[in-house]
Amino acid sequence: MAVVKPFKAVRPSRDKVALVSSKSYEAYTYAELGAKLDFNPFTFLHKEFKKNRIFIKEKTPSFYIYEISDLDDTYCGIIAATSVEDFKNGVIKKHEGTIKKREVLFENYLKTTGFNAEPVLLMYEDDENFDKVISIIKEARPEYEFSTTDKKLHRLWLVQNEQEINKIISFFNKEKSLYIADGHHRSASSALLAEDLKAENKNHKGTENYNYFMSYLIPESHLKISEFNRFIKDLNGHTVEEFLIELDTYFKIENRGSNLYKPSKKYHFSMYLDGEFYSLYLRKNNYTFNDALSKLDTEILYRTILQPILGIDDLNNNNRIGYTNDKLDILSLKTNVDNGLYKVSFGMLP
């Protein structure tokens, strides 16, 4: 049973949302940041955005249906408050390790700001009947409808009708699991914060806001994951030849030479080892697909290579593994191994 609840969002007023919306500051060059701050008085990057009433606070707890579309794809999901307890007890499934230092950094940010500015991306399994519930809500006029310079159309609907709210709550109450697609550190830091504030609160009831974190929940069919490459510092005592023999249990292996190589489909990985790229095709007959998590490439890599062969049980606290999300540049798969930082790297299909 997954717990979701409506919440009172702090959000831009309808007439200013297109000007307020912003990518993470890290996504901009210094010149772009300067231009936005100099020429857009409503940008989210300004410290005064709340003081000047550019933002409003919702009067009643609400869910939010958020849709992003471009010429190629449409993604639609629900922004809701999700339970820290679900994260701790495994209802919300994790498939990535986290770095303790970053968890603490994010927790300090939450303590300082008291603000969830970016939701955790959660996946739930597709359900046609629930799709119809969302479609009916979307027949109303959206609260927001605007385009951004990356040629995406953004639309958002408020869900404040009690019947519709109860339908959403009821659907997720019947879901056995939710899956983190992005935001492992954000959710882990929310759990840390909840523990700290619970310890400080003698009258803790479990219903306080710190027991929840903001999430964007989308169906599995709407999920598109960017590549997030893995780097391992050693072969866990194996020679290169022994390692390749071990891999053969789960994968059909093809040597692709020294030229950069990317995987082409699901259940297919690229590997760079000893100056050469390899393609790894999963032998599906040798692997058990038993739930939605087991179908994710990241989980397949863990269950077939990282844990059984390379001996990495705890992705959270193992300094032998590194990550990078080079969405446009696969060169790091090669350079991070050639320069001696790592022994082997794995690339996955975005």
Enumerate the language-model features and the residues they cover:
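A cross-family signal for N-terminal binding/gating loops and helix N-caps
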Residues: M1-P350
